[in-house]
Amino acid sequence: AHGAGGEVGHACVEPEEEAVCNCGNHGCLEQMTSATGIVRLAKKYLASHDTPSSLRERGESISAKAVFDALKEGDAAAEAIVQEFSEYLGRALAVFACVVDPEVIVVGGGVSKAGKPLTDCIQKYYQKYAFPSCKSTPIILASLGNDAGIYGAARMVIKD
């Protein structure tokens, strides 16, 4: 009816977010859990906490990769940032699972390069918020990585 079916990335997960999403709203899932969202969360965290972090040395050039690299090195600030990111995503996935009841949840895109530590963290929050019968749904990484959308689009063209 409105062309918005499947736009789950624009479900509001943080109504207090001040930054505006590209859709015009605030606190959308995509805004909070994309690579740029992780950068925004990192900058916000570092500005409001005194936690020592290797990320501080990067100044404005923080990237999602830098956050995940710092996490692997045991950086406490990176851990807090990834926990916040994972809570947003895990909670949203728990809501979506109530609607679509998936056999498996596949995480893709640039952030999926963080690997198993990321899916473990997302799974923790997913299980915290999921409807009891959905709690065992596994969360895995997309095997096609960031190219999954390209393969899917090509498949649709070939199929039609």
Regions found by a protein language model. Give the residues of each.
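Short, intrinsically disordered, charge-biased short linear motifs at domain edges
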Residues: 5-14
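ATP-binding/phosphotransfer module of carbohydrate and carboxylate kinases, centering on a glycine-rich
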Residues: 15-20, 25-160
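Short Gly/Pro-enriched turn/cap motifs at secondary-structure boundaries
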Residues: 1-2
